[in-house]
C-alpha cells in the first residue's frame, strides 16, 4: 500500500493578515483531505522550527500571508530543515515583500511601475511629500493593510501615522495615484492566467473588499481590448520571472484607458502568497482556465521543492 504524503499546511501566524491566512489554510487543508493526503494544520508561532522538526512532514504548503510567511523567513526555516515547500523561495519572497526593491527589479525588467518615494513614517506624517492624489502604503505588508489615499491638497496626512502603536513599520512607500481599471492576473503552472477586472465602491481594493463576500465585483475576462489583455498577461509573467517567483503568484495592475495603447498600464505589486479563500482571485482565475480548486491545491503540493 502506497504511503500517503504527509502535508503540513502552515497557516495563521502573527501578522495583520492572520485571519485571511486561517481561511486560506482551512480551504486548502480541506481540499487536500478530499484528495487523500494526510494533513496536519499548523498554526505558526515563533517555535515553528521546533514544531516542524518534530512533525517531519513530507511537504509544507505555505498558506501564510504577511510576515513571517511571505518575507522569506518561513522559507529559510524550511530550507534549513530540508522540508520541500510550495510557492516562492527565500530570495523571491523577501524581494517581492519589500515593495520598493521589487519595483526597482521589475522596472529594470521592463515592467512599468508607479512613480513613488520611500520615506520614513515621520516624514510622510508631517507634510505632503508629493502633490495629491497619492497612496501611502507600508513597504512590507500585504492585503492593502495600512494603506491610505490622500486625494486633495487641503487634506492632512492620515492621523493613523502618528500612532505610537503603528504596527506596519517605519518605512512607507508613497506612490502617485494611478487612475483607471483595477486588474489582476496570476501565474499558475508556469503560464499566465486570464485577467480579472475588479470593480468596487471603495477608493481602492482594500482588505474588506478583498475578503468580504460582495465586497467587490469581478469581471472575467476583463473588458479590455485584446492587445491590452495580452499585455497584462505578458507583464504578469515577466514580473514573476524577474523576481524569481515559483509556483503561484499574482500581479496587480491599474490601467488608464484614456492613455493611448498600453502606456496607461502600471504594475502595482506582485504577491507571492496570494489568498486562497472562497472570495480570492487565484482560485477564480484557475477555474477559468479549467483547473478546479482541489486540482490547484494538489498541484501546489506536488510542485513543492527545496532551493526555490
From Swiss-Prot:
Domain ATP-grasp: 103-302
Pathway involvement of the protein, from the record: Cell wall biogenesis; peptidoglycan biosynthesis
InterPro entries in alphabetical order: ATP-grasp (IPR011761), ATP_grasp_subdomain_1 (IPR013815), D-Ala_lig_Van_CS (IPR000291), D_ala_D_ala (IPR005905), Dala_Dala_lig_C (IPR011095), Dala_Dala_lig_N (IPR011127), PreATP-grasp_dom_sf (IPR016185)
GO terms assigned for molecular function: ATP binding; D-alanine-D-alanine ligase activity; metal ion binding
Residues involved in Mg(2+) 1 binding: 252, 269
Gene Ontology BP annotations: cell wall organization; peptidoglycan biosynthetic process; regulation of cell shape
Pfam families in the record: Dala_Dala_lig_C, Dala_Dala_lig_N
Binding residue positions for ATP: 130-184
Functional description taken from the UniProt entry: Cell wall formation.
Protein's name according to its UniProt entry: D-alanine--D-alanine ligase
Species annotation: Rhodopseudomonas palustris (strain BisB18)
Amino acid at each position: 500500500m502506497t504511503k500517503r504524503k504527509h502535508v503540513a499546511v502552515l497557516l495563521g501566524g502573527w501578522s495583520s493578515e492572520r485571519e485571511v491566512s486561517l481561511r486560506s489554510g482551512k480551504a486548502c487543508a480541506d481540499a487536500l483531505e478530499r484528495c487523500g493526503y494526510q494533513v496536519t494544520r499548523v498554526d505558526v508561532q515563533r517555535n515553528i522550527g521546533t514544531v516542524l522538526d518534530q512533525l517531519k512532514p513530507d511537504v509544507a504548503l505555505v498558506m501564510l500571508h504577511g510576515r513571517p510567511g511571505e518575507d522569506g523567513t518561513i522559507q529559510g526555516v524550511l530550507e534549513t530543515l530540508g522540508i520541500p515547500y510550495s510557492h516562492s523561495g527565500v530570495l523571491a519572497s523577501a524581494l517581492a515583500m519589500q515593495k520598493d526593491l521589487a519595483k526597482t527589479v521589475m522596472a529594470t525588467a521592463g515592467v512599468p511601475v508607479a512613480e513613488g518615494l520611500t520615506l520614513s513614517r515621520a516624514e510622510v506624517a508631517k507634510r505632503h511629500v508629493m502633490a495629491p492624489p497619492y497612496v501611502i502604503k507600508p513597504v512590507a505588508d500585504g492585503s492593502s493593510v495600512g494603506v491610505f489615499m490622500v486625494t486633495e491638497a487641503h487634506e492632512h496626512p492620515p492621523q493613523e501615522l502618528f500612532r505610537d502603536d503603528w504596527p506596519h513599520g517605519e518605512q512607507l512607500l508613497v506612490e502617485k495615484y494611478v487612475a483607471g481599471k483595477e486588474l489582476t492576473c496570476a501565474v499558475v503552472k508556469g503560464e499566465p492566467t486570464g485577467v480579472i477586472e475588479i470593480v468596487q465602491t471603495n477608493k481602492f481594493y482594500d482588505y474588506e473588499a478583498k475578503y468580504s463576500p460582495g465586497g467587490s465585483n469581478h469581471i472575467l475576462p476583463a473588458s479590455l481590448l485584446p492587445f491590452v489583455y495580452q499585455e497584462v498577461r505578458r507583464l504578469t509573467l515577466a514580473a514573476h520571472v524577474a523576481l524569481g517567483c515559483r509556483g503561484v503568484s499574482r500581479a496587480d495592475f491599474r490601467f488608464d484607458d484614456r492613455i493611448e495603447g498600453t502606456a496607461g498600464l502600471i504594475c502595482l505589486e506582485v504577491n507571492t502568497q496570494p489568498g486562497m479563500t472562497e472570495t480570492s482571485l487565484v482560485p477564480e482565475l484557475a477555474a477559468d482556465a479549467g483547473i478546479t480548486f482541489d486540482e490547484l491545491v494538489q498541484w501546489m503540493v506536488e510542485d513543492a521543492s527545496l532551493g526555490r
